[in-house]
């Protein structure tokens, strides 16, 4: 019996060993799956991809290819020799405290002698940690090929920013903060400018919007390489990762702590176009913008998009826009309007015009096209000195410009009381170079409308102000055209429609409520970072509603009286 039990025990032991041995490959595979989630382009193995993690700390395991070690940083900077770990395999524990390198250098971006703008560090704001890694060879040389991962800890984008795209932009902090070349700082440009007579006068008067600084510089030389990650609403991993060029954009709003940006997609960055459904359509883009709101930056933030959205339906172009949240090197940078921008690609997509055949004039300069295309614009401007009440002359005018587009466009901008609109400011029109599209006639594009409809509670944007007469004074071609009875009839029809349909008070109220339902919950975090302005926001909303409540009964009689004179 004892021998029988011994034999049985041996059989059981062998069976267990066999089962364990058979399971070991599967157990090892599962263990590897927990450690190895993906292999980066530079060959480093990571346990975790970029994305959202419901943890206050995250342990990331990294392993280099054989013969290499790993250099890494967690502040957004590019790894160098001093960042070499001396190891080919290691763990790094990431936490919220590692984010904040840019805001920690806020003194480089603020200008207290000119304004009182704010840029605050607040640990309650959502944040991501930027983990940059590079390989180090046996000689200690650090590779230029950097892998950038961004880990957002203990944040749920879907709950925090419902309905918004989240855009994460990473770049070497020197591109933003360097004294000579950083695009977010006052920098060397400001220090040189403030010693000039013009600079001294601006500082004395505190007319901060006239200041010159690194962040007011324009052009390709001020474009910086960056890495972009885009999260759709509800996504926990990036839906897109792409390299691009980054510039500060805008006019006076460049001085704000929260600046607007333009993103450029070029072959030099690896992608000639961005192909992604930014606006729920799978489209290709050469360039897009993240707009802080311009004159509306610390007010509603959505006023430009709101005004343009209400105005849709006229024969003018309104580009797509949607709310987005920006993280800059993992740091919360607030809500923006993500906007489609003018380009030959955009016009081709919208209207089917060959990209090489598109001409866009912005603020009396060629924006898209050839230098000599300015002559086409000058041909239009020449009608300012002609008698458009003459039928033959007006017929020629109609061959050059789409008069329906012109009537609708001018009606819209006059009705909203646009106080920041002249031929050389925020005025855009386009055509095909030849006659293949719409006979080569000029059509209009709506651009930057937030300085309107009671903005700043100024007389310039008041519902009582005669913006019709202002347009006649500021736009010589419009002055000539409005004297023609046929064009006047088109314009009167268009402005009445704008007031009775597009900007009907009840419709404005409804649309305002809809926009505020999305944007309102985004503002408390914005205030934490860039300063409290909720009172101004409330006043702006009230002023906008008041404008449209009063506007029709004031501006329409003005236009009617003109026709009777």
Placement of each model-derived feature along the sequence:
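Bacterial N-terminal signal peptides that target proteins for export
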Residues: 1-9
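Bacterial N-terminal signal peptides
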Residues: 9-18
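Middle-to-C-terminal accessory/interaction subdomains
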Residues: 165-167, 174-189, 194, 202-206, ...
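Beta-sheet entry/capping signal
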Residues: 59-60, 69-70, 121, 130-132, ...
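Conserved ATP-binding subdomain of kinase catalytic cores across diverse folds
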Residues: 169, 201-372
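C-terminal motif of bacterial Sec signal peptides marking the signal peptidase cleavage site
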Residues: 20-22
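Extracellular and select intracellular beta-sandwich modules with Ser/Thr-enriched
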Residues: 142-148, 319, 423-425
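Short, compositionally stereotyped local motifs that mark structural "simplifiers"
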Residues: 25-225, 230-232, 239-243, 430-431, ...
């Amino acid at each position: 019996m004892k021998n029988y039990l011994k034999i049985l025990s041996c059989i059981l032991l062998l069976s267990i060993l066999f089962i364990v041995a058979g399971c070991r490959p599967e157990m090892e595979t599962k263990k590897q799956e927990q450690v190895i989630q993906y292999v980066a382009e530079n060959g480093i193995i990571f346990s975790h991809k970029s994305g959202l993690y419901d943890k206050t700390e995250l342990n990331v395991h990294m392993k280099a290819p054989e013969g290499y070690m790993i250099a890494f940083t967690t502040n957004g900077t590019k790894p160098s020799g001093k960042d070499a770990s001396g190891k080919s395999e290691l763990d790094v524990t990431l936490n919220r405290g590692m984010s904040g390198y840019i805001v920690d250098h806020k003194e480089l971006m603020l200008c207290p002698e000119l304004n009182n703008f704010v840029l605050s560090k607040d640990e309650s704001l959502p944040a991501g940690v930027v983990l940059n890694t590079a390989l180090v060879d046996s000689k200690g040389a650090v590779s230029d090929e950097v892998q950038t991962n961004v880990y957002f800890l203990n944040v749920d984008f879907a709950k925090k920013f419902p309905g918004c795209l989240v855009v994460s932009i990473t770049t070497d902090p020197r591109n933003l903060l360097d004294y000579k070349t950083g695009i977010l700082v006052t920098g060397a440009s400001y220090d040189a400018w403030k010693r000039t007579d013009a600079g001294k006068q601006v500082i004395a008067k505190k007319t901060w919007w006239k200041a010159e600084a690194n962040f007011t510089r324009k052009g390709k030389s001020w474009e910086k390489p960056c890495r972009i990650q885009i999260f759709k609403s509800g996504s926990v991993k990036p839906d897109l990762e792409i390299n691009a060029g980054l510039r500060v954009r805008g006019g006076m709003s460049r001085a704000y702590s929260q600046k607007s940006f333009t993103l450029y997609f070029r072959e030099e960055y690896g992608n000639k176009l961005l192909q992604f459904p930014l606006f729920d359509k799978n489209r290709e883009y050469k360039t897009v913008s993240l707009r802080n709101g311009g004159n509306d930056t610390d007010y509603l933030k959505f006023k430009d998009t709101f005004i343009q959205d209400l105005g849709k339906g006229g024969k003018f172009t309104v580009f797509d826009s949607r709310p987005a949240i920006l993280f800059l090197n993992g740091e919360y940078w607030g809500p923006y309007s993500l906007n489609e921008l003018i380009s030959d690609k955009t016009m081709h997509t919208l209207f089917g015009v060959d990209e090489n055949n598109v001409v866009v004039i912005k603020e009396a300069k060629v924006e898209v096209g050839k230098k000599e295309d300015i002559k086409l614009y000058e041909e239009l401007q020449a009608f300012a000195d002609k008698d458009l009440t003459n039928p033959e002359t007006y017929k020629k005018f109609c061959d050059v410009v789409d008069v329906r587009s012109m009537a609708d466009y001018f009606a819209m901008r006059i009705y909203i009381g646009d106080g920041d609109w002249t031929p050389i400011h925020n005025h855009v029109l386009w055509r095909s170079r030849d006659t293949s599209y719409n006979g080569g006639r000029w059509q209009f594009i709506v651009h930057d409308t937030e300085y309107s409809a009671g903005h700043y509670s100024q007389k310039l944007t008041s519902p009582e102000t005669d913006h019709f007469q202002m347009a006649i004074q500021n736009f010589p071609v419009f002055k000539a055209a409005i004297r023609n009875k046929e064009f006047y009839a088109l314009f009167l029809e268009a402005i009445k429609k704008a007031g009775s349909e597009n900007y009907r008070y009840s419709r404005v109220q409804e649309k305002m409520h809809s926009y505020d339902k999305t944007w309102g919950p985004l503002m408390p975090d914005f205030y934490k970072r860039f300063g409290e302005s909720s009172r101004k926001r409330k006043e702006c909303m009230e002023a906008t509603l008041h404008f449209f409540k009063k506007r029709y009964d004031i501006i329409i009689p003005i236009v009617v009286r003109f026709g009777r004179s």
